C-alpha cells in the first residue's frame, strides 16, 4: 500500500488525433511500462492527475496505479506539460519491481539562496528536476542543492552534488555533467548602461 493512488483505463484509440480528442474530453494520455511486461497505453482523468501532483512528493514516491481494477506499483518517469499554461499533457510511468533499478525524476530543492544574493548575485535555476537511477526503496524525495558558498560566477553542476546512498544521476552516468544552477551578476538594463557611459 502506498500513500498515493491513481485510477486509469486502458486506451486503444492511439495517435495524435486521439490524444487531442482525449484532452478535449478532460482526460490525458499516459503510458506505463517496465517490469518485464508489455507497455500499456492509458487514459487518466486530467483533474485527478493534476490533484495528485499538486503534492511534490508524488514525483518521488511509489504510486498505486489502478488500471481497470488491476493494481500495480509505479513511479513517474516523465511528464509533459503545456509550455504556456503548465497543465499536464502526458505522463510516463514505470513499474516498480523489487530488487530492480528504475529511473525516475525527483525535484530539486535549493537552500541558502540568500547567501549569494547578499553578495550581489542573481541565481538562475537551470534544472528543477533531476533524473535518477535507483531501487524504489532508495528513491529520494528531492535532491538538495546548497548555494551557501556560491559566489558570483559560480556554476553548480551535477558532479558538485552528493547523490544519496544507492542513487545515481542518470545524465552524469552518461557523461553529461549538466549545470543545475548558476550565480551571475545582475543584468544591467540598456538605459542604465547608456547613462553610465555619459
From Swiss-Prot:
* GO BP terms, alphabetized: translation
Which key words tag this protein in UniProt? Ribonucleoprotein, Ribosomal protein, RNA-binding, rRNA-binding
Q: Which GO terms describe its molecular function?
A: 5S rRNA binding; structural constituent of ribosome
Per its UniProt record, what InterPro entries does this chain match?
Rbsml_bL25/Gln-tRNA_synth_N, Ribosomal_bL25/Gln-tRNA_synth, Ribosomal_bL25_b-dom, Ribosomal_bL25_C, Ribosomal_bL25_long, Ribosomal_bL25_short, Ribosomal_L25_dom, Ribosomal_uL5_bac-type
Q: Which GO terms describe its cellular component?
A: cytosolic large ribosomal subunit
| HAMAP family from the UniProt entry | Ribosomal_bL25, Ribosomal_bL25_CTC
Q: Which family does it belong to?
A: Belongs to the bacterial ribosomal protein bL25 family. CTC subfamily.
Read off the NCBIfam families from this record. Answer: bL25_bact_ctc, PRK05618.1-2, PRK05618.1-5, PRK05943.1
Quaternary structure annotation from Swiss-Prot or TrEMBL: Part of the 50S ribosomal subunit; part of the 5S rRNA/L5/L18/L25 subcomplex. Contacts the 5S rRNA. Binds to the 5S rRNA independently of L5 and L18.
Summarizing the function annotation, the protein's role is: This is one of the proteins that binds to the 5S RNA in the ribosome where it forms part of the central protuberance.
Identification of the protein by name: Large ribosomal subunit protein bL25
Q: Which organism is it from?
A: Pseudomonas putida (strain W619)
Q: What is the lineage of its organism?
A: Bacteria, Pseudomonadati, Pseudomonadota, Gammaproteobacteria, Pseudomonadales
Q: Which gene encodes it?
A: rplY
